[in-house]
């Protein structure tokens, strides 16, 4: 894991000088040069956001992913609270989607096929012997070099054009992701937009692994979580979603009021 962790998704900021200084070392200890490489004629890089509240977020256009989130606690001590790696090579070697944007469709699609408007679309399976497709296929959005459309003090705008037929999905699809850091508050917003020229399915997601203590030897059971969601999508014994939307009330997934993760045995479901 090379000295990378995870943080509460609450505050980032971008240091403009990071876009120009190849020798930069971030507050989290990352070196920009370790994220600069060429892949099939496209270039990867590291972008650093930071604000006056002491937060720093590092983002790479490889997979439009978060590499680190450094956030201060109530005593001003800063910790990196997301899992990750220290070089672009390590991200390319692993298959766990650390910090990445997942698409076109997060999760599994049963038997790697779906029917839309009466037309069956056969996808390219990548989920072992199951014959399903997982997280949009291989390669997915997490493996792509995203175009950097904007990089200023508090914003990074990235885009990717997924061509018609990529992994079997219909339609040319342009996805734009904007990471925005609050200037006066430790809050990070992720905004996705997508346009397509044909009917298709889309289920984008962000895939960071968090431990907001900053200590990855500790369990997350005692950490508090709040999720403003009334329903969830259950999955079957094949780990494919059933298509239902069920209420979270009375389940371990009910975080409408903040409570510790271990309180309802969420980690065991």
Predicted stretch roles:
Residues 77-141, 239-249, 253-255, 260:
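Active-site loop/turn microenvironments that scaffold catalytic and metal-binding pockets
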Residues 25-52, 120, 124-185:
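Extended, loop-rich substrate-binding clefts of extracytoplasmic carbohydrate-active enzymes
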Residues 48-51, 55-61, 161-217:
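Acidic, contiguous internal or C-terminal segments within carbohydrate-active enzymes
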Residues 267-269:
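Conserved small/polar residues in nucleotide/adenosyl-binding loops
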Residues 1-7:
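Bacterial N-terminal signal peptides that target proteins for export
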Residues 16-18:
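C-terminal motif of bacterial Sec signal peptides marking the signal peptidase cleavage site
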Residues 36-85, 104-106, 110-125:
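Beta-strand-rich N-terminal accessory domains
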Residues 7-14:
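Sec-dependent N-terminal signal peptides
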């Amino acid at each position: 894991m090379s000295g990378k962790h995870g943080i509460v998704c609450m505050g980032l900021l971008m240091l403009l000088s990071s876009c120009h200084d190849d020798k930069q070392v971030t507050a989290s200890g990352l070196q920009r040069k370790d994220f600069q490489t060429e892949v099939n004629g496209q270039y990867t890089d590291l972008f650093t956001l930071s604000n006056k509240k002491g937060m720093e977020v590092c983002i790479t256009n490889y997979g439009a992913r978060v590499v680190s989130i450094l956030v201060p606690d109530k005593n001003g001590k800063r910790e990196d609270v997301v899992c990750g790696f220290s070089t672009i090579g390590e991200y390319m070697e692993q298959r766990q989607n650390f910090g990445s944007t997942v698409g076109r469709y997060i999760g599994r699609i049963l038997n790697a096929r779906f029917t839309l408007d009466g037309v069956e679309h056969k996808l390219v399976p990548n989920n072992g012997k199951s014959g399903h497709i997982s997280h949009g296929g291989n390669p997915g959005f997490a493996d792509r070099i995203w175009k950097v459309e904007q990089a200023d003090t508090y914003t990074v705008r990235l885009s990717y054009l997924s061509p018609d037929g990529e992994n079997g999905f219909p339609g040319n699809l342009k996805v734009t992701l904007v990471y925005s850091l609050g200037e006066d508050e430790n809050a990070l917003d992720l905004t996705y937009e997508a346009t397509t020229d044909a009917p298709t399915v889309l289920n984008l997601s962000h895939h960071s692994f968090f431990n907001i203590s900053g200590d990855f030897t500790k369990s997350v059971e005692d950490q508090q979580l709040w999720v403003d969601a009334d329903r969830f999508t259950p999955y079957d014994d094949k780990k494919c979603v059933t298509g239902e939307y069920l209420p979270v009330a009375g389940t371990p997934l009910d975080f409408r009021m903040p409570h510790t993760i271990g309180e309802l045995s969420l980690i065991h479901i």
